[in-house]
Amino acid sequence: MKAKVHVTLKQGILDPQGKAIEHALDSLGFRNAANVRVGKYMELDLDEKDKAKAEAQVKQMCEKLLANTIIEEYRYELQ
């Protein structure tokens, strides 16, 4: 089973990398890009057939390591 995990900063948390990209896009003439947010994307191959068990494992991975839940939020999908 494959897990796709997206981790982003929570709303209200300053994203300096996103701001830098937004300014760079503006300087390149892409003036219609605004509120750029940068995050992380991960794919994990899980050796698990049971979807409920895989979901529980991915949630634990996110809570314990993949996301800093104080400032980041995460979402995932299983395939």
Predicted features by range, described:
Residues 48-51:
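Helix N-cap motif at beta-to-alpha junctions
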Residues 42-46:
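Short, well-ordered beta-strand segments in beta-rich or mixed alpha/beta enzyme
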Residues 2-4, 8-41, 53-79:
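Long, contiguous binding/interaction regions
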